[in-house]
Swiss-Prot record:
Subunit structure as annotated in this protein's UniProt entry: Homodimer. Two dimers interact with Tse6; this interaction is crucial for Tse6 loading onto VgrG1a.
A Pfam match: DcrB
InterPro entries xref list: DcrB/EagT6 (IPR014894), Mog1/PsbP_a/b/a-sand (IPR016123)
Organism: Pseudomonas aeruginosa (strain ATCC 15692 / DSM 22644 / CIP 104116 / JCM 14847 / LMG 12228 / 1C / PRS 101 / PAO1)
Domain of life: Bacteria
Cited function: Plays an essential role in toxin Tse6 delivery to target cells and specifically in the loading of Tse6 onto VgrG1a.
Protein name: Effector EagT6
Length: 144
């Protein structure tokens, strides 16, 4: 059994279970900007592939699947000793432009992903809160 820690509780789960949990936070409207979302998810699909290949595959899938996809930024970064990649891109849903800022953090057995979803015009209004949250993100060691 493995200890699993939630914000509200701790529990033990069988070792064979795979964590696919998602944490969703709503950012309040800020000035003229509408609400945004900040999501933390886990993805075990990296497998044995190099992290760069995993990120390239994720980017390729987004490009194929998201209408009006446009990549704005791709930065290789390091978060407390973990390889990470920041992607800023936009796409269209129901005729509306959406802006995503994703950070992929290598942490086996699952990549940790943070996603800020807003609009291109609203990003500057939500960016300070996003930066503040991300500066406090410290990946925990992988349980043995």
């Amino acid at each position: 059994m493995t200890l699993y820690r939630l914000h509200e509780a701790d529990l033990e789960i069988p070792d064979a279970w795979q964590d696919q949990s998602i944490n969703i936070f709503k950012l309040p409207a800020s000035g003229p900007a509408r609400e945004a979302s900040f999501v933390i998810s886990r993805d075990a699909s990296q497998g044995d592939a190099p992290f760069a290949d995993y990120v390239a595959r994720q980017l390729e899938n987004a490009e194929k699947q998201l209408p009006g996809f446009k990549l704005h930024k791709r930065w290789d970064i390091n978060i407390h000793g973990h390889a990470a990649v920041l992607l800023d891109y936009q796409w269209q849903r129901e005729g509306r432009d959406l802006m995503l800022r994703q950070v992929f953090i290598e942490r086996r057995p699952a990549v940790l992903i943070t996603t800020l979803t807003t609009t291109p015009a609203d990003l500057p209004h939500h960016e300070p809160a996003w930066k503040q949250a991300m500066q406090t993100l410290v990946p925990r060691p992988t349980p043995s």
